[in-house]
Amino acid sequence: MTYSVLKYENSRLEVLDQTRLPGEAVTVELSDLPSVEEAIRSLQVRGAPLIGLTAGYGVCVALRGAGSASEARSRGPEVLERLSKTRPTAVNLFWALERMEGCLKGLPEAGWFEALEAEARAIHEEIKIQDSAMAGHGTSLLAPGARAITHCNTGPLATGVLGTALGVLIAGHRLHGGMHVFVDETRPRWQGAHLTTWELANHQVPHTLICDNSAAALMRTEGVDSVWVGADRIAANGDTANKIGTYSLAVNARHHGVPFYVVAPSSTVDLNLPDGAGIPIEQRDPAEVTAPGGRPIAAKNTPAWNPAFDVTPAELVTAIVTEHGVHKGPTYDLAKALGR
C-alpha cells in the first residue's frame, strides 16, 4: 500500500489523519489557520520534522487570502505566534517558523505568495535530503538479520518522507534483509502500536509489538542488537528529548549492554540549550492516561501525570545519527560536529 503523509498542491494542504490509523487511512484538508493548529495539537500530524513542515505550509494556508505582500507581512507575526504555541517541545517547529519569518520579512511585492510557497517547498526538499542521508549513515550500524527495538513512531509518518530512526530500520531491511523490529506500544497515545506497526506492515518489515514495560525482559531473554529512537529536541551536549518512555528504554539498554542510537536531522539540535535541563516538556491532558480513547480505566477523579516527553542524558546515548554522519558518544560537542 502506498500512502501520502502530506501533499501541498494548488495552494491546498492535505494531510493523512494519523489519529484514525491503523483502522483507516483518511486524508483531510487543512484549509485555514485554526485547522492547521488543531491538526498539530490533536496529533493528526506529529513527529518533529512533520510538525515543522506542516507549520511551514500552514503559514502559506493562513496568508493566501492576503491582498498584498505588505498585508502578509502585517498578518504574519500573529500567524507565526499562534503556530509556535501548538507543540512547545519540537524544535523543528520553531526552525521552520523562523525560516518562514525570514521569508516574510523579505517578501517581494510581485510574486510574494509564490515566494512564500517556495520557502515551504525548500523546507520540504531539505527534509527529503536529510532523511536519505540519515538512512545511509544509520544503516552502516546495522548488520544483516539485526534485531532492534524502536519507540514511538519515527517513519514516514513522522517526517513526510522516509523517516528518522524507523527510516533507518526500513532502509536496513531493504539493504540487508532479515531485520526484525520490536515495537514499543508507546503509551498513552499508542503511536508504536497504531502507527509504527502499520508502517512496518506496509513496508513488509517483520516486526513484533511489545508492551512498554517488557523491553528489559526482551533484552535479557530474547536478545536485542540495538535500540533506535528519534528526537524532538537535542541539546548541544547530546541530551535528548523524545517521546515519554525513551529514558527508561535507554537505562534498560545500558544495563544490558545494548547500543542506543538517536536519529534526527540537524534541525532538531538546539544549540541555544547547553544541556537538557532547559528543554520545555509539554504536559498533555491527564485523560489520555485515565481514559484512553474515551474509555475510563482508572477510578473516577484519579489524577494522572502525563508529560509527552522525557529527556535522556547524553551519556546513555551510544551515537547520534544526523544527515552529517554518525556522532559517537559518550560525550558530544554538536556545535563542532555540525560545523556551526
Predicted regions and their residues:
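Acidic-glycine-rich active-site phosphate/pyrophosphate-binding loop
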Residues: E24-S35, P144, T221-G230
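Small-aliphatic-rich amphipathic alpha-helix that forms the alpha element of a beta-alpha
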Residues: E37-V45, I51, S248-V251
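SAM-dependent methyltransferases
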Residues: M1-E9, E14, F113, K328-R340
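Positively charged, low-complexity intrinsically disordered leader regions
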Residues: M1-E37
